[in-house]
A protein has these predicted regions:
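Short amphipathic beta-strand/extended segments with alternating polar/hydrophobic composition
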Residues: 59-60, 90-91, 210-215
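Secondary-structure boundary elements
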Residues: 93-156, 164, 232-234, 243-257
Length: 257
């Protein structure tokens, strides 16, 4: 198992037109095969993903559908389509309103902040933009903290952005869950068109699940995200999360169309 630092692209204040700086972190990077640059001009992309953990299965998510899954003796191969989809199911969404050790939605500071967005026309977008601007110290290497502490400290990377976003959404009565996976970046740590580890949020609003990424609320492109697992935030490293991260160590991703 490789221990990965949760990293994000675009964590500097890009809303001010600044270029994102390269963060001095150790990151796990996957260089996709095929015409990777084409992903940035597409709305829908199909990937072939291979890895050696036969038990690991990519989830159905807001932005992705598993078209084919073949488990061989030594490895698994998945054909995955990413991009806009009609993921409307709300089954079991009630549990995504609960508090957890990291989503401490009972804390007064979290409840009061969430209340500001309850009656807005777009609470999901409003909370995403708030978190993006509120976390001003965009840095990595912070131990996983509860949302109330993140709200106070105003520091962190994609993990802290996602925890605070999910907590505020739940406190506002909107089911929300955190997702771990990879996102495609035009450039990261001197390498172009690569997938890097990332965390984001899915929120159930308006009768459907939607993707919310408070590290880049103005720059969400659904085909650039690949979800590996949902993080329960009951513990720092739940089993589904560990399995997903383990599969990253030998994964190959190829854009096929």
């Amino acid at each position: 198992l490789i221990l990965l630092t949760a990293i994000c692209i675009g964590l500097t204040p890009c809303c001010k037109g600044e270029h994102a700086s390269v963060l001095p972190v150790t990151a796990f990077i996957i260089e996709p095969e095929g015409d990777a640059a084409a992903v940035f001009s597409e709305k829908i992309t199909t990937f072939r993903i291979s890895y050696q953990d036969r038990e690991f299965v990519l989830p159905r998510a807001v932005n992705q559908v598993v078209l084919e899954h073949k488990a061989g003796e030594l490895s698994s191969t998945v054909i995955l389509r990413t991009g806009p989809s009609a993921y409307l199911t709300g089954t079991g969404r009630g549990r995504y309103l609960d508090a957890t050790p990291y989503l401490d939605i009972h804390k007064m500071a979290v409840k009061e902040k969430a209340a500001l967005f309850i009656k807005s026309g777009d609470p999901v977008g409003g909370i995403s933009h708030f978190v993006h601007g509120h976390i001003t110290d965009k840095k990595t290497g912070i131990p996983m903290l509860p949302a109330s502490v993140i709200l106070q400290n105003r520091a962190g990377d994609c993990t802290e952005h996602s925890i605070l976003t999910a907590a505020l959404l739940r406190a506002a009565g909107i089911p929300a869950r955190c997702v771990t996976g990879v996102i495609m970046a035009r450039e990261f740590s001197g390498r172009r068109n690569v997938f890097v580890y990332h965390m984001w949020v899915e929120a159930y609003y308006g009768g459907r699940w939607i993707l919310a990424d408070s590290t880049r609320p103005e720059d969400v492109h659904l085909n650039r995200y690949i979800a590996f697992a949902y993080h329960s935030l009951e513990t720092e490293t739940p089993l589904d999360y560990i399995a997903a991260i383990s599969s990253l160590t030998d994964m190959t991703i190829r854009r096929i169309r």
